[in-house]
Amino acid sequence: MHVFWFIPTHGDSRYLGTSEGARAVHYDYLRQVATAADTLGYEGVLIPTGRSCEDPWVVASALAPVTRRLKFLVAVRPGLHQPALAARMAATFDRLSGGRLLINLVTGGDRTELEGDGVFLDHAQRYAQSEEFIRIWREILSRSHEGGTFDYEGEHLSVKGAKLLYPPVQKPYPPVYFGGSSEAAHDLAAEQVDTYLTWGEPPAAVAQKVADVRARAAQRGRTVRFGIRLHVIVRETDAAAWAAAEELISRVQDETVAQAQAVFSRMDSEGQRRMAALHAGGTRRSRADLEISPNLWAGVGLVRGGAGTALVGDPQTVAARMQEYADLGIDTFVLSGYPHLEEAYRFAELVFPLLPAEVRERIGGGRAAGPLTGPFGEIVGNQYVPRAAQS
């Protein structure tokens, strides 16, 4: 099991859908979140992409020098990047960071935003372009270790004599992650990527996705790993966690929800459509309606695009729900929570000790006990080491 955190380059707050409790997106804060994730033992961080975010490559380049082990899951965008240039960027970052780059292949699902970026392709064309893009990207990087060149002529992209002089640290290339819920996305995942990511849907729906992508990959003689993108709201008690969930959306106005859902509804993303269906396009607001599966809450998706669900509960419950997904084949959890700095600490303190032993070993850098200094807390009376309370 691999546990990642999230760098909130599109903003952060104690509440959703309002400027109350908001935090400015500046380097000092992003650095705090990154160094916290690194120190606490998260394996990596996802850096989001899109016009509402700071550029992920620039952010990752700024954060790599202030972290030690943290990996960076950074987007490449077919249509915005050329594959040869993207390969060069990836190899350079991987070399300078000591092999800490992971690639997030993002096709995009908002036609309005895509057209603003100069991409005028429909859904099918974008996936065809993405398939050509990542094929070229992989080949250029793979051949760079032996000094080889690559020729390719496709419908959307072509290269002749493509060559990379400085190969990446990771062989044959930094691992490729990708998410999508359409038939075309599942085919692309089966054919080209290393880890297929899904947004946080109920376990039965996730099981169907995993089975489908796994079967398509097997038909091609490949195996694919699986990950899930979720928010988390964990507190010491179940009641406190659900109270925090309600508080998170307590300032949201109906008008704000309507505006957000109007934007989401225009997208041609199958994943976004599935997220919206979980809360009926923003019409469901009570806990009874938004708890779409035990401890899986769709409240985040009222105003947030992309991943719109959160695991909510006490540490034991959240760890158990994660294990349910792991039993389906999920081995990577890309998590986030509001505010991202505080929730990174809460999750690490409360849930990390409950994860499988091999995860705790990796988090603790070889120490089975976990990531906290000591890990015993503050010395009592200048000499006594605190012990865990007996239940």
Curated annotation (Swiss-Prot):
<comment type="function">
    <text>Catalyzes the desulfonation of aliphatic sulfonates.</text>
</comment>
<dbReference type="InterPro" id="IPR019911">
    <property type="entry name" value="Alkanesulphonate_mOase_FMN-dep"/>
</dbReference>
<dbReference type="GO" id="GO:0008726">
    <property type="term" value="F:alkanesulfonate monooxygenase activity"/>
</dbReference>
<dbReference type="Pfam" id="PF00296">
    <property type="entry name" value="Bac_luciferase"/>
</dbReference>
<dbReference type="InterPro" id="IPR036661">
    <property type="entry name" value="Luciferase-like_sf"/>
</dbReference>
<protein>
    <recommendedName>
        <fullName>Alkanesulfonate monooxygenase</fullName>
        <ecNumber>1.14.14.5</ecNumber>
    </recommendedName>
</protein>
<dbReference type="GO" id="GO:0046306">
    <property type="term" value="P:alkanesulfonate catabolic process"/>
</dbReference>
<keyword id="KW-0503">Monooxygenase</keyword>
<dbReference type="InterPro" id="IPR011251">
    <property type="entry name" value="Luciferase-like_dom"/>
</dbReference>
<comment type="similarity">
    <text>Belongs to the SsuD family.</text>
</comment>
<keyword id="KW-0560">Oxidoreductase</keyword>
<keyword id="KW-0285">Flavoprotein</keyword>
<dbReference type="InterPro" id="IPR050172">
    <property type="entry name" value="SsuD_RutA_monooxygenase"/>
</dbReference>
<keyword id="KW-0288">FMN</keyword>
